[in-house]
Amino acid sequence: MTQVMKYTVFSTPFGWITCFGSVKGLKKMTLPQLSPQQSMDLIGEEIDSAEHDPDFFNDVIQQVLAYFDGEEIAFNVKLDYGDATPFQKAVWEAARTISFGQTESYSGIARRINKPGAARAVGTALRNNPLPLIVPCHRIIGADGGLCGFGGGFAMKEALLTLEKASD
């Protein structure tokens, strides 16, 4: 049986976010973009055959908006990692354990998943993270504490970390 895919686009104080998923869970979510179209374009061609259903994503939307209001949110969302590798899933789940307002290094994530020395592979897995914010890759920093590697750009990474620190 074919899975009915759904999507919605909504506005946040940081920009427009698109959610994409099914009853199996949230499969993709964009970082905030300047326009709804830019946000939808990041999902890819899959969105063309999906059903627009804002109500389906109401829980996700409410949690994301609370996050941008500075609430300490541990996202409680059913996720669908699709065809991700076991390593990617382990990295993403380890990233989800980093608390609001905290950071961890790539090598720290590698140690958490019992793969010391795999910091670069952790970076690759995070670069392919389809669920930023939910899988908070913005909380991953360099071993020296510097901001590095973030698909949303350094300005967005810094803004998200600043939002979380200001809410501590």
What role is predicted for each listed range?
Residues 120-129:
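Regulatory, non-catalytic segments
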Residues 1-115, 163, 167-168:
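Basic nucleic-acid-binding alpha-helical/helix-turn surface characteristic of O6-alkylguanine DNA
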Residues 98, 129-131:
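Substrate-binding/gating loop at the entrance of the active-site cleft, primarily
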Residues 116-119, 160:
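LysM (lysin motif) carbohydrate-binding repeats in extracellular/periplasmic proteins that recognize
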Residues 143-168:
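…primarily DNA-binding HTH/wHTH and HhH modules…
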Residues 134:
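Major-groove DNA-recognition helix of helix-turn-helix-type DNA-binding domains
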